[in-house]
Amino acid sequence: MNISGLLTGYGRVKLGICSFNETVHRGKNFARTYQAVKLTNRAMSSKQDAPSLASADEQDKFITDVFEMCMKRVVQGTRDRNTPVVNFKTPEELKELVDFDLTTDGNHQEDLLSLCEKVFDYSALSGHPRFFNQQYGGLDSYGVAGSFITDVINANVHTFEIAPMFLMTEVAVLEHMLKFVGYTNGEGTFCPGGSYSNFLSMNMARLWKFPETKSTGIYGLPKLVSFCSEQAHYSAKKNSTFLGYGTDNCWVVKCDDRGKMIPEEFEKLVLKCKDEGSVPLFVTATAGTTVLGSFDPFNEIAAICSKHKIWMHVDAAWGGSALLSKKYKHLCDGVHKADSLAWNAHKMMQAPLQCSVVLFKEKGSLERAHSLNVPYLFQSDKPYDVKYDLGRNLLQCSRKCDALKLWLMWKAKGDAGFERQVDQAMANAQYLTEQIRKRPEFELVIPHPEYTNVPFWYIPPSLKGKEKNEDYFKQLASIIPTIKTRMQKSGTLLVGYTPVGKIPTFFRMTVMNDKANFSDMDFVLDEIVKNGKDL
């Protein structure tokens, strides 16, 4: 350290000692003041003052200030469509704008509030009515309140004694969701995301087919094969890897031109599997595929599974919410025949992330698969019904409560409120589809989208009237990401894009936020034209 630094450090120590003597003389808290002196002495080797530990009142004010920030910047801010969906910065730019480094000494609360402001400044606002980038979004006030309560209480939902209200709300929500699926004697659990729900179901299938493997393991088993469609979520293959079956043994079933699994192709693969001496174990059918929003033919798939003794799982993470609507529940016709079903409430239902459920047709499945004797945690002589110690039947021990926020939302809205949300999202998607049909600069990827995924191309003037050959689609594939980047940088709109199979890159709109309206759908198309007409 140079002389100037030493003198500065000495001055700080001197000031700290004076403050210490004066404070003791006034009879204030000795321990806190002593801590302040220790921190001041440390400053001799640092470039700036290290703050003392904030008082309880100061910490309370910090929480209040941050909460007010949340209300102003997000809850109220996203109601104004002039608020940018995102103030996009690259990783390199963010490193220049924000100090991400962690240090030995803490920061002053004013600095922390400034950092919190920057989190709002540079985050994508998924609650904005013009956020269409992924299959989550919206901002539900009751869900946010439930999340806040959950974090403040900070309970672990494995036993009733430490999380009584949380476990009771979880049981209530699960029982209600089971009714919508049609599982009259089922059970379920909340999971950390839809991929985990799909994983748990695949693991349950093995234990259903080979219950002895709970203790003996998979050694000596024949080759186990799972199946999924070309449009299934990638977790179907990842879970095959994680469970030791291998991606080579996750067989992909062909889809029709609407993105639906072809049952005849599924059965062909099942017969081939058997001919090879392997065991057809598990199939993932999808309710609302990620890209095209397609619903597989569940009744036909269920018949094949029953015939060949295959566990049928429905990944309804995205499309399960159609069950909430009398008008659209037919999309899920036959899902009650499946052995398990995944449903993400943080998608169409707009619960705050994360809020995922997996449901099983047969009660007792989870206990048979996962329960162990854990006397330090799951005793049988407690002063309440230990069936509410849900952790005994799960793979996880530490588990956050994801049920309270959804329970509060359901209490506030009722079934009818969620039905209106789904119907509004469907109305928006159908309006957008009709506008695309009417405007010559747009073209639908599939003629009749059945859910709220609306896949389409924008055809700029430079490609109008040209032959749709390989070069045409190559140019089209490069134009769409450019338009997306322009909108992202201006902050006006976030919408995804993707290719699928042999279909070249297109825009993939996923509509779920019920605060969006027909004007927002028009804005999407107008904004794309505005940013792409010169390409």
Regions found by a protein language model. Give the residues of each.
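N-terminal entrance/gating region of PLP-dependent enzymes' catalytic architecture
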Residues: 45-185, 485-495, 510-516, 523-528
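Short loop-beta-helix segment that forms the pyridoxal 5′-phosphate
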Residues: 177-203, 251-254
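Active-site C-terminal subdomain of aminotransferase-like
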Residues: 289, 308, 333-440, 461-462
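Short beta-strand
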Residues: 190, 443-449, 495-500
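Conserved PLP-enzyme active-site core in the AAT-like
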Residues: 197-367
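N-terminal mitochondrial targeting presequence
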Residues: 1-44
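PLP-dependent enzyme catalytic core of the Aspartate aminotransferase-like
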Residues: 466-470, 499-535
